[in-house]
Amino acid sequence: MNLDHSYATHLGDLGALTKPLRVANPQLVEVNHTLRDALQLPASWFTQSSIMSMLFGNTSSFTTHSFAQKYGGHQFGGWNPDLGDGRGVLLGEAKDKFGKSWDLHLKGAGPTPYSRFADGRAVLRSTLREYLASEALHHMGIPTSRALCLITSDEPVYREKQEKAAMMIRVSQSHIRFGHFEYFYHNGELDKLKRLFDYCFEHHFSACLHSESPHLAMLEKIVTDTATLIAKWQAYGFNHGVMNTDNMSIHGITFDFGPYAFLDDFNPKFVCNHSDHRGRYAFEQQPSVGLWNLNALAHAFTPYLSVEQIKGALSQYEASLMAEFSQLMRQKLGLYENTQNTAELVNRWLDLIYQDKRDYHISFRLLCEVDEHGENQPLVDHFIQRDTAKTWLEHYQNALITQGVKRQERQANMRNINPEYVLRNYQAQLAIDAAQNGDFSRFRKLLHVLQHPFESKPEYAEFAKPPPNWGKHMEISCSS
């Protein structure tokens, strides 16, 4: 079996052929077998000897077309044209059983022409975090890139301190970012911009070609997909942390994991990135940043669309986001009617857990056990403001009774949308600490529960607990 190389073949001057550089003592330590099988990749590839030969062998044809892509991006609101794949290469594309194409991208591959004097490596810490987060989001139903396999090494790399290098093969529909379009537009390379659009229409947005204005249809698709994604982030309490436009995928998926976090206590102003001193990418700011980023992308459509067309496409963002968010929040509360009363119940519930600084995920999981005819003491005892909680609960119970859905059915549905297990940063750190000492057992155990987030099992109770005080609201470094 061979990979396809459509991007490198058709857009070879939009980047550079770059072979991966071997790390010291590479070891294949984890393979995502389910994803491997979905991509119809041979199991024989994913052995220690085979994958090392394919990635680093002097005569390997596997990396003949490995490719570093060039792009720019708005970083914390400022334009930076000097970006690109600085630590990874596109290996090629594999097709699943439905004929859909998926990029295979090697992260931590070593220096590229876009490394900006850096070593081109990824550290074990950040690689494990991306592996865990992408699997956690995928199994919650949130669109995301995914991790195919993990390779460790003994090679030292230097960030805030000395760490070990690692590699990961990432899978995504493509690795085309908002910043690809921005770069060629702002650089005045309109021929390359046109070829990038043509490539996207052929390989990723073919349905748009049937529209009167394919470029408008493409922009509208990116707008609504991005809105839907960010609505899911908000509903599931996920803070990306570094929503620069070079970290935004044209497919509306979670992409480029850095200093992310799932919420602990519900705090809309939470900032997970310790470099984000002004809170630009705070949890509550994500919807507005999403629109800002889409507006930045839309400039690249101006050679093809009028200002009115672009404004019309961008105007769909808020309605798409709110429709998805409202539906998800109703489902999380087990409410099926889209009424003003339902919206008020959702807002008052969020205000209640915010005022009492309750854990976002545990609060929703407790809500799954509510009996519309019972006292529900465990839920009441969960709050400091018990009288306020009781008042809200009475209104909630009345709404449940009015809609008439059987309790067992409602509770089952709620348990399938409110996860028992989410990726807490402190749990990730415990797994990282063990892995850095050669023990991947905690990483694998954590990975297993994140791949089954809605299935409560007594033997995994430690992963459902709220974080200890030292593990709350951890701010994470961008260094990777």
From Swiss-Prot:
It catalyses: L-seryl-[protein] + ATP = 3-O-(5'-adenylyl)-L-seryl-[protein] + diphosphate; L-threonyl-[protein] + ATP = 3-O-(5'-adenylyl)-L-threonyl-[protein] + diphosphate; L-tyrosyl-[protein] + ATP = O-(5'-adenylyl)-L-tyrosyl-[protein] + diphosphate; L-histidyl-[protein] + UTP = N(tele)-(5'-uridylyl)-L-histidyl-[protein] + diphosphate. It comes from the Bacteria. GO terms for molecular function: AMPylase activity; ATP binding; magnesium ion binding. Mg(2+) binds at residues 247, 256. It is an enzyme of class 2 (transferase). Keywords: ATP-binding, Magnesium, Manganese, Metal-binding, Nucleotide-binding, Nucleotidyltransferase, Transferase. Its EC number is 2.7.7.-, 2.7.7.108. ATP binds at residues 84, 86-87, 107, 119-120, 170, 177, 256. Nucleotidyltransferase involved in the post-translational modification of proteins. It can catalyze the addition of adenosine monophosphate (AMP) or uridine monophosphate (UMP) to a protein, resulting in modifications known as AMPylation and UMPylation. Belongs to the SELO family. This is Protein nucleotidyltransferase YdiU. The gene is ydiU.
